[in-house]
């Protein structure tokens, strides 16, 4: 199984995985509208020979089979206040 990965031009670090190049037929229209015009990032085999950054390969494969797509969102931002308070407590 292969997947085609597209990056969002509107949302930083947001990626859309589909099974076939330029086939967004199973992706909800509202998601595509918010995602923007998908920009091809890469095509990867999902056989475990390559590691996915920021996504679990099993979850991606399951989502592709069941829903027809997988949406990878950016990691949550760390709270600067939390970091500051943590550093202040170390002093």
UniProtKB/Swiss-Prot annotation:
Domain YcgL intervals: 1-85
SUPFAM superfamilies per the UniProt record, alphabetical: YcgL-like
PROSITE patterns: YCGL
Pfam families in UniProt: YcgL (PF05166)
Domain of life: Bacteria
PANTHER family found in the cross-reference section: PROTEIN YCGL (PTHR38109:SF1)
Protein name: YcgL domain-containing protein ETA_15380
Taxon lineage: Bacteria, Pseudomonadati, Pseudomonadota, Gammaproteobacteria, Enterobacterales
